[in-house]
Design a protein with these regions (language model features):
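Positively charged n-region of N-terminal signal peptides that target proteins for export
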Residues: 1-4
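Bacterial N-terminal signal peptides
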Residues: 8-18
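Conserved functional acidic sites
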Residues: 23-280
């Protein structure tokens, strides 16, 4: 969910966090993360060298246009708030143009819950970098990590905070909406699909639905309510990259990581550089 429209609505975000789980607002306990970069949650597995391509449409202010997102699990890690997080590299294309290149930092605790520890999203206009205003890093500037996927998701679980970054108006929440759903995407048809509902309390009428299946992860994204962006995506391809492709991804992701120390020096300078899990 884009945050530019809600960055000034932090008062509403504060109200939302007042009722958030203590685990999501009090900071991480590194002792609960003995092997954080190994993410094997059944509903959200992130194996290094895996690339997911989702395609569909979205309205980014120019009407509904072709939209494609490429999520790549790198073999890099970065220490965030005392936890060694796995680095993902995301590329967001709208109307055929690259609009955003992003590093995200995820970790799995010993119970199997997957956490979001921060994001460095570069924005581009006509191929030129314009900045990364929505950057947030857990443990810095009041930001706190949030939950991406529960260890044991089921209907009736209380909603959970996906991250808390008041400086940019980020306070997205999620809840398990349905289980046992059947959903067909270009890759194949899946049964026993888990559906989550996501929203920002500052935009209570705008919701995003995400569909997950065991052993794969996110296979579909849909919009609900008054979500003006109307992002709709389906899983188009899952790729297990060769050693050469993984090496290229590593180099490109490290370029973003190095550039972040200049583009968002106020936050990023407090973090150590990303590094490979093993020697390249």
């Amino acid at each position: 969910m884009r945050r530019d429209a809600v960055a000034t609505a932090c008062a509403a975000c504060v109200l939302a966090v007042a009722g958030a789980p203590a685990a999501a607002t009090a900071g991480l306990d590194p002792a609960r993360f003995s092997d954080p970069a190994t993410i094997d949650n059944a509903w959200f597995p992130l194996a290094p060298g895996t690339q997911f391509t989702l395609a569909g449409s979205a309205n980014r202010g120019e009407g509904q246009r072709r939209h494609r997102v490429v999520f790549t699990v790198t073999d890099l890690t970065k220490i965030i708030d005392g936890v060694r997080a796995l680095v993902l590299w995301d590329r967001d294309y709208n109307g055929g143009r690259l609009e955003e290149g992003e590093l995200t930092f995820h970790a799995q605790d010993d119970a199997g819950t997957v956490w979001n520890l921060g994001e460095y999203p570069e924005e581009y206009e006509h191929g030129r970098l314009t900045g990364a205003p929505d950057t947030w890093i857990a443990g810095l500037s009041r930001a706190r990590a949030g939950i991406l996927m529960l260890a044991d998701p089921h209907v009736g679980t209380p909603s959970y905070l996906q991250g808390w970054a008041p400086d940019i108006g980020f306070a997205d929440r999620a809840r398990v909406l349905r289980t046992g759903v059947r959903s067909c995407v270009p890759v194949r048809c899946y049964g026993d699909v888990l559906v989550t509902d996501e929203w920002n309390p500052a935009e209570p009428g705008a919701h995003q639905r995400k569909f997950y299946t065991r052993g794969v992860g996110n296979i579909r994204v849909g919009a609900a309510g008054h979500d003006t962006e109307g992002e709709v995506l389906v899983l188009e391809r899952v790729r297990h990259m060769s050693a050469g492709a993984r090496s290229w991804v590593r180099k490109e992701a490290l370029k973003l990581d190095r550039r972040a120390y200049r583009v968002k020096a106020d936050l990023y300078r407090h973090t150590p550089p990303a590094e490979p899990m093993t020697a390249p």
